[in-house]
Amino acid sequence: MNRPRPVEKMVGIIKKLPGVGHKMAERLSYHILKMPQVEVDRLIDSIQNARRTMKCCSICCNLSEHDPCPICSDVTREKNIVCVVETPQDLIAVSKVEDYKGLYFVLGGALSPLDAVGPDDIRIDKLIKRLKRDSINEVIIATDADSKGEITAVYLADIIKILGIKVTRLGYGLPVGGDIEYADEITISRAIAGRKEM
């Protein structure tokens, strides 16, 4: 027996989320159907509210309710150092490290030739414009330690060095192939402290 068409449509939409396969999408769909209507309404409202209120910071491209975001607006932060991350989730992970007091830039992804993601598909041009405009002395590249993150790091380092800006990469402590957003605060803190010049 086939699933009813409305359930099939839910499964098709939910499995488009990152990390959600067909079976998980099916479980989530049936779970949502069993939820009390008030909970379903709250879920829908929270999604719509987040979509409506969240903005991309015009300076760092982080998601925020305000533009500029609270980090870019914080006058106590070091304005001459920028940590470049792939996603807002990575920014949140690094920002939990109290040792780092600089600013951020969210690329919105990583270079991936196999997936046809090139420099024009992420915010590299916007980053370079910011680096030319602001008085930045150092860029910490905090992309993931997988092949996409490494390709992105090398590409960025080559471009940024031409601007005469010091480029460093997070030091050891992050597992090869690992995502920054899943690393604990101590690991990220050690990686920042042990960053290497590129």
Curated annotation (Swiss-Prot):
HAMAP family: RecR. It comes from Endomicrobium trichonymphae. Residues 80-175 form the Toprim domain. A zinc finger (C4-type) spans 57-72. GO terms for molecular function: DNA binding; zinc ion binding. Keywords: DNA damage, DNA recombination, DNA repair, Metal-binding, Zinc, Zinc-finger. May play a role in DNA repair. It seems to be involved in an RecBC-independent recombinational process of DNA repair. It may act with RecF and RecO. SUPFAM superfamilies: Recombination protein RecR. This is Recombination protein RecR. One of its GO terms (biological process) is DNA repair. Belongs to the RecR family. The gene is recR. Pfam families: RecR_C, RecR_HhH, RecR_ZnF, Toprim_4. SMART domains: TOPRIM.
